[in-house]
């Protein structure tokens, strides 16, 4: 399904843990890493597509995660001209994405597996610092990643504990 402007509706998934780290997945047989993502099928809501992609790509089910946020807007990126399939109809020039911030529920990390539905999209994963993906994702996705991570940061980043200064009793945030 491609819209009238040539963009394919898609969902992106940021999975975080309680330490504010995010799941970073390595594309199958490649050296590139990204967040899980995938197309929205006809008749499917973005949330339904997210849960389907979550299972197909990462092996997680709805009971393994908690939805913390959904992006306010659809975020678009254009594909580099060399990646556009000009002979297809209609021509897809990029993706428009609705993003979801999920928290992996405690004790569910062992359920992460690849290839639950056909050919695996990924062959490795790791926890990385929250902002790491913005610098590391393929260049044409960086602006979308920057925007979505900025939107999700207040919810995903752990709030530092307040410490009381023993000398004068004032409250300080750790540096």
Swiss-Prot record:
A single MF term (Gene Ontology): mRNA 5'-diphosphatase activity
Gene Ontology CC entries for this record: cytoplasm
UniProt GO BP: mRNA catabolic process
Cofactor(s) demanded: a divalent metal cation
Class of this enzyme: hydrolase
Role of this protein: Accelerates the degradation of transcripts by removing pyrophosphate from the 5'-end of triphosphorylated RNA, leading to a more labile monophosphorylated state that can stimulate subsequent ribonuclease cleavage.
Protein's name in the database: RNA pyrophosphohydrolase
Species of provenance: Aeromonas hydrophila subsp. hydrophila (strain ATCC 7966 / DSM 30187 / BCRC 13018 / CCUG 14551 / JCM 1027 / KCTC 2358 / NCIMB 9240 / NCTC 8049)
Gene coding for it: rppH
């Amino acid at each position: 399904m491609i819209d009238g402007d040539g963009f394919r509706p898609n969902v992106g998934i940021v999975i975080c843990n309680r330490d504010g780290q995010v799941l970073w997945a390595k594309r199958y047989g490649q050296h590139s890493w990204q967040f899980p993502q995938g197309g929205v099928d006809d008749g499917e809501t973005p949330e339904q597509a997210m849960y389907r992609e979550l299972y197909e790509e990462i092996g997680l089910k709805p009971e393994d995660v908690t939805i913390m946020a959904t992006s306010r807007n659809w975020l678009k990126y254009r594909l580099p001209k060399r990646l556009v399939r000009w002979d297809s109809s209609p021509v897809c020039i990029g993706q428009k994405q609705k993003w979801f911030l999920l928290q992996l529920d405690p004790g569910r990390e062992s359920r992460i597996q690849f290839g639950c539905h056909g050919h695996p999209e990924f062959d490795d994963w790791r926890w990385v610092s929250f902002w790491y993906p913005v610098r590391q994702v393929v260049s044409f996705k960086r602006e979308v990643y920057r925007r979505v991570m900025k939107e999700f940061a207040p919810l995903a980043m752990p709030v530092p504990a307040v410490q009381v200064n023993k000398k004068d009793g004032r409250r300080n945030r750790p540096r």
